[in-house]
């Protein structure tokens, strides 16, 4: 992944004079540098910048507030969720109180971070369906990986009529097997 993104950033920088066309990868794989604005810096260094090592964090999924569609390529809306008191305190002692509050009263944590759409196949489609838009390759739209449609078109989902395999009961969401 790192090689692909760096190569894409280099090519689009030479071609367009900006690295913005490489953002479609970052919506799912590099949200910390993307949403902090660092990803758009042509000099951004994934190896030496701490945000370059963040990867796919808990907040990658749990900061989502809405699934905008099943088109993939990071088609979602995010917002900074409410936090427990002292979560970002400079004091290690106060941060430890915040961690204890999560353990003592996990309902708030669960309510603010686990949304009903997290249990849907559509949620998974936001990142597990990808394509290269014409704006990226200056050619035409190209399908990348697409686990969402494959799931829907399989007998496992219960949506496919002509499948060769049907489980005893259809599986309505990816997370029943994969999480």
Q: Where would I find each of the regions flagged by the language model?
A:
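Sequence context of c-type cytochrome heme-c attachment sites
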Residues: 1-54, 60, 65-119, 125-168
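Catalytic cores of secreted or luminal carbohydrate-active enzymes
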Residues: 170-179
């Amino acid at each position: 992944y790192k090689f692909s993104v760096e190569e894409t950033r280099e090519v689009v920088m030479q071609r367009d004079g900006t690295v913005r066309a490489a953002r479609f990868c970052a919506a799912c794989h590099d949200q910390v540098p993307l949403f902090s604005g660092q990803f758009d810096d042509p000099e951004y260094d994934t190896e030496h910048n701490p945000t370059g090592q963040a990867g796919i964090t808990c907040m990658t999924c749990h900061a989502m507030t809405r699934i905008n569609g099943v088109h993939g390529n990071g088609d979602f809306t995010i917002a900074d969720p409410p936090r427990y008191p002292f979560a970002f305190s400079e004091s290690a002692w106060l941060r430890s109180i915040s961690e204890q509050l999560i353990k003592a009263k996990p309902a708030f944590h669960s309510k603010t971070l686990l949304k009903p759409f997290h249990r849907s196949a559509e949620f998974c489609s936001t990142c597990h369906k990808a394509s290269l838009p014409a704006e990226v390759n200056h050619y035409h739209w190209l399908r990348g990986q697409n686990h969402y449609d494959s799931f829907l078109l399989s007998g496992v989902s219960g949506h496919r009529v002509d499948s060769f395999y049907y489980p005893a009961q259809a599986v309505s969401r990816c997370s029943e097997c994969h999480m």
